[in-house]
Amino acid sequence: RVRRMLEQGRLHLFAASIRREHERWWVSLQGVAAVCHTARRSSKGRHTVQAGMDRGVKSLAVVANAEGVVLRTVEGVNALKHAQVALRRANKAYSRTKIGSVGRRKAAARLGRIHARVANLRRNTAHQLSYWAATTLTTLTVEDLNVAGMTQLRTLARSISDAGMGDLGRMLSYKAGWYGLEIHHADRWFPSSKTCSACGSINTDLTLADRVYRCPCGLVLGRDVNAAINLARWPELSTASPPRPAAA
């Protein structure tokens, strides 16, 4: 793709950097390029109803539209969690080797391959989900999560990092521009999980342990699904006119 853009004069490079990572060589190019994927910005075959995406630890993402229909649920790969046994063995083998020895270099390479596999699995899931959203949906609302702040919580730091919510948000942002997806970012203080998607009441007693949302109005719904529906309706709520005072 880069070669074709260079031949067509749609890309002008001005810098390049080379690095070695996980026993592979990587070349990063910097330049000025024309708009990509202009031919794919079509609304044909897309969901026309506004959609919302709730990102989390148990489920990486739940996508639902404003009408309450769940469009997709993606479970996290938990690559780091599943690799803990292999990582412990590789770290132990590395610690037993001598500094500067061939064995240490081989042990470091094995350890690097495990970390590379974890990162690749996480990145692959985020790429697939962001591509689906950018090419299937018309309008998507996601929360403006403070991922860096969330990783400061000792009880959730590893799970949040393993989920890759930051990578998913970044990919959604640039692929939305590529494929013509209209994306909105709801305020991080918007109570999407605590608000009932049926009656609009807010359950201030809801905790992270409550995976099912139960409302006195009779609604019983998965917490993530309820949040995704509320996010799908957020653009209308955020632009709604404030109530006028009653006439004296």
Residue ranges and their predicted role:
Residues 15-248:
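Positively charged, helix-rich recognition surfaces that bind polyanionic ligands
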Residues 1-20:
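Acidic carboxylate diad motif detector
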